[in-house]
């Protein structure tokens, strides 16, 4: 029978790597607690219509990349390709964003897109999402950016990432700009790359995001979106930049930054790095003030961002910013298999009384010699021996594995005090 293998584009997190995730997740929680954001947990399956109405039917994600299927009732369902739409659905369904209410939320979990797998891009990938609802002013824009900046500083990578900013204006601004862009591109139709030609009919703004050099040269003299944005929104964007200057957050303006999701309005941003090759974006977000209303809720201001956790881990690893793994246990018990009913009770009592200790043993209970070999391999500092003689005398044997000392004895009723020292 052939050996089963993992699905292409999916990854196992092996025991030797799980500590990296635990480290990153602990830093994420530390920062989000600092800003008083509440964790929420969302289903990985949503109705397909949710993403059609939010991400956009013409977007690359919905048109090319979603995992869609019908359940046994014939309902069209989708493995979530991103988290914002599901979070908005939850907020609406549970009346968390009615007028006057505010919410500051975060979540972390797997997303699914059928893309060509490569370093930093997978078909199942983990994403941290941070979302805020009901805040109209600039202050929330700055706070959301500051959260990402604080996380990068906490991880020691702030000097290796760059914040890029743009404003998409209102939906009317974008409609007017789209017409001007199409008019400009008409003479260049035959010279555009294949993807850009497809986007002319479906999502022309995405052409600005093309990485093809020839297309970029064509766009060099194209109309600028900023020239079509209302005065008030342009002033708000300018003020946002001024506040970031005051906060000491480095950034650069990127007039071609448009984001690949249809729901964004106003401010959009990305954090990029030059350390990961083509997968340079590690964080992206912006305002999506119309999405709650578009999905059946009230008209509520909203902003958020997402961080690709695998890409962030790759960056941390490449820069040597991950801590060394410490798999060593603290205490290794060496037990007599004939007396397990007594010795295991002692071990379990110590585990309950001293939960901070990592305690292990050889569950095959071989000879004492073989158990000592496993104790040495475990990296434990101390081996505690409980055999028939120890039980008869009321004393456990103590062997310091990393020191050249004689074996000691400690009374069973003093073991906890001994291990606390």
Swiss-Prot record:
Q: Where does the record place it?
A: Cytoplasm
**Complex formation:** Homodimer.
**Keywords from the named record:** Aminoacyl-tRNA synthetase, ATP-binding, Cytoplasm, Ligase, Nucleotide-binding, Protein biosynthesis
Q: Which GO terms describe its biological process?
A: histidyl-tRNA aminoacylation
Quickly give the catalysed reaction. Answer: tRNA(His) + L-histidine + ATP = L-histidyl-tRNA(His) + AMP + diphosphate + H(+)
Provide the species name. Francisella tularensis subsp. holarctica (strain OSU18)
Which family, according to UniProt?
Answer: Belongs to the class-II aminoacyl-tRNA synthetase family.
The protein in question is named: Histidine--tRNA ligase
């Amino acid at each position: 029978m052939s050996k089963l293998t993992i699905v292409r584009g999916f990854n196992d997190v092996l025991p030797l790597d799980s500590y990296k995730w635990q480290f990153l997740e602990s830093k994420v929680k530390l920062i989000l607690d600092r800003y008083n954001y509440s964790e929420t947990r969302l289903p990985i399956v949503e109705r397909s219509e949710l993403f059609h109405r939010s991400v956009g039917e013409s977007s690359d994600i919905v048109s090319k990349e979603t995992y869609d299927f019908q359940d046994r009732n014939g309902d069209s369902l989708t493995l979530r390709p991103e988290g914002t739409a599901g979070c908005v659905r939850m907020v609406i369904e549970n009346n968390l964003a009615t007028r006057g209410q505010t919410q500051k939320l975060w979540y972390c979990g797997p997303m699914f897109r059928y893309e060509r797998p490569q370093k930093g891009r997978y078909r199942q990938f983990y994403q941290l999402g941070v979302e805020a609802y009901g805040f109209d002013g600039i202050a929330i824009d700055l706070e959301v950016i500051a959260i990402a900046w604080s996380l990068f500083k906490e991880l020691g990578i702030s000097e290796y990432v760059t914040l890029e900013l743009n404003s998409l204006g209102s939906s009317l601004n974008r409609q007017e700009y789209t017409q001007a862009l199409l008019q400009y591109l008409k003479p260049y139709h035959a010279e555009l790359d294949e993807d850009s030609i497809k986007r002319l009919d479906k999502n022309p703004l995405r052409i600005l995001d093309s990485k093809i050099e020839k297309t970029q040269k064509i766009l060099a003299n194209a109309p600028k979106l900023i020239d079509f944005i209302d005065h008030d929104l342009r002033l708000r964007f300018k003020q946002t930049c001024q506040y970031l200057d005051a906060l000491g957050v480095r950034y650069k303006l990127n007039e071609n930054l448009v984001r690949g999701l249809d729901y964004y309005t106003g401010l959009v941003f990305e954090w990029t790095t030059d350390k990961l090759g083509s997968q340079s974006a590690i964080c992206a977000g912006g305002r999506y003030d119309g999405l709650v209303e578009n999905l059946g809720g009230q008209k509520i201001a909203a902003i958020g961002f997402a961080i690709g956790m695998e890409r962030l881990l790759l960056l941390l690893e490449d820069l040597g910013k991950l801590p060394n793994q410490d798999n060593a246990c603290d205490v290794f018990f060496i037990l007599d298999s004939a007396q397990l009913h007594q010795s295991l009770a002692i071990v379990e009592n110590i585990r309950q009384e001293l939960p901070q200790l990592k305690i292990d043993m050889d569950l095959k209970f071989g000879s004492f010699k073989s158990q000592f070999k496993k104790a040495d391999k475990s990296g434990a500092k101390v081996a505690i021996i409980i055999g028939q003689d120890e039980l008869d005398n009321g004393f456990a044997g103590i062997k310091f594995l990393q020191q050249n000392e004689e074996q000691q004895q400690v009374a069973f009723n003093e073991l906890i005090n001994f291990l606390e020292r």
